[in-house]
């Protein structure tokens, strides 16, 4: 723009004074600008279908704290001129949760009909984060005109919570039905995950107590027969570090029991929980982790309590009225404590209560759960996950 204004000013001066030389000098910058604009306009990267993009992310999803490798290819569409790739400058865009707020540094490889970018992203926060679109810039051969456009679509990278490998105490999870808890009756180990009755099912496989409770026939599933179902309850705190710690702990526990062969369900107290559907087919590793991606925490104690009570009401649908319950809890009020005490009347329960040793509400919650027959440890948010799990299992892993 400055060069164009300068040329017009010099040309106007030459015209005013009748100077052919000044007019010629003023015309040259204007011609350069016009030619440059025509040059970049002909091969404008944002116009038409001359360029195609393809972006791959490995791995996707990625865990918090891990690095993903991103590759972007900008290639010529069929019949497009190679001039579209000449002197093309590329810049990728990424959410701050993937870039850390720093410019992305990519390795660029140029070929006759394609340009490839490769760069790493560091997942710093759980969620779904934007990647792209690509920003492409072209400058004319004279360096006087520049065009900028976006290319390709915005894509989403899913970030799972950070998890740790936890050992599963087989002698506890499998032999637990033989252990009596205070005031509890423990179901047999063959009361594994249940599913709806289908025509042709052997009536000897009907689980009559659960059928009576639900008003419909359900049968014991053959899947992982003899392996005790495990349900992980997550009591979400308010957004913050405590929430991320609780989610990582609950996800790690769920993955550990699932990996040990136990039908495992993760109840998070959100509208996405569907215990009725969950009992038809135990979720796999990816489904367990996907259930944690969009969790945002509870706004207050009342909302957290209501969500936990809803989870407890859905327990029978999740595990068929049997199985081990592992709860990641915050300090509970009277209603929450009473509901959790009722859980231990029909199934064994383990609980990790969130709170420091001098947190009176957390200590009172842990004490009442122990009286009701729960196995309980109290841990402060941020504590080492493996050490916390080790304390809960008594080191029998």
Regions found by a protein language model. Give the residues of each.
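Short, structured coil/loop segments at alpha-helix boundaries
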Residues: 19-23, 83-85, 95-96, 112, ...
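Acidic/proline-rich low-complexity IDRs
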Residues: 2-5, 133, 165, 368, ...
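Intrinsically disordered, low-complexity regions
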Residues: 15, 19, 27, 80, ...
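Exposed, interaction-prone extracellular/peripheral surfaces
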Residues: 162, 199, 203-397
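An amphipathic, basic-hydrophobic helix/alpha-beta surface used to engage anionic
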Residues: 35-279
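Extracellular/lumenal glycan-associated context and N-glycosylation machinery
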Residues: 1-54
């Amino acid at each position: 723009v400055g060069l164009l204004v300068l040329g017009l000013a010099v040309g106007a001066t030459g015209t005013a004074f009748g100077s052919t030389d000044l007019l010629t000098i003023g015309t040259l910058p204007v011609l350069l600008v016009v030619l440059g604009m025509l040059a970049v306009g002909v091969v404008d990267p944002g116009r038409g279908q001359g360029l195609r993009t393809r972006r791959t992310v490995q791995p996707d999803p990625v865990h918090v704290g891990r690095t993903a490798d991103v590759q972007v290819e900008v290639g010529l569409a069929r019949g497009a001129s190679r001039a579209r790739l000449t002197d093309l400058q590329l810049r990728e865009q990424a959410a701050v949760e993937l870039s850390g707020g720093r410019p992305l540094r990519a390795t660029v490889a140029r070929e006759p009909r394609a340009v490839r970018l490769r760069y790493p992203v560091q997942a710093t926060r759980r969620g779904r984060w934007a990647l792209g679109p690509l920003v492409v810039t072209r400058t004319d051969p004279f360096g006087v005109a520049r065009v900028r456009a976006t290319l390709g679509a915005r894509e989403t990278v899913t970030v799972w919570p950070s998890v740790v490998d936890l050992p599963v105490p087989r002698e506890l999870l499998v032999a637990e039905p033989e252990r009596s808890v205070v005031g509890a009756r423990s179901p047999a180990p063959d009361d594994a995950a249940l599913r709806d009755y289908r025509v042709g099912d052997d009536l000897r496989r009907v689980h009559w107590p659960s059928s009576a409770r639900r008003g419909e026939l359900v049968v014991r599933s053959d899947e992982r027969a003899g392996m005790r179902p495990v349900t992980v309850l997550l009591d979400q705190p308010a957004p913050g570090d405590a929430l991320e710690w609780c989610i990582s702990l609950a996800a790690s526990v769920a993955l550990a029991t699932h990996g040990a062969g136990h039908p495992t369900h993760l109840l998070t107290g959100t509208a996405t929980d569907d215990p009725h559907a969950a009992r038809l087919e135990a979720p796999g590793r990816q489904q367990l982790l996907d259930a944690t991606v969009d969790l945002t925490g509870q706004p207050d104690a009342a909302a957290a309590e209501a969500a936990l009570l809803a989870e407890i009401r859905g327990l029978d649908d999740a595990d068929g009225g049997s199985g081990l319950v592992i709860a990641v809890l915050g300090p509970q009020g009277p209603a929450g404590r009473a509901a959790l005490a009722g859980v231990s009347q029909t199934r064994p329960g383990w609980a990790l209560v969130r709170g420091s040793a001098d947190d009176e509400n957390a200590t009172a919650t842990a004490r009442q759960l122990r009286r009701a027959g729960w196995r309980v440890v109290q841990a402060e948010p941020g504590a080492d996950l493996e050490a916390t799990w080790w304390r809960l299992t008594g080191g029998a892993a």
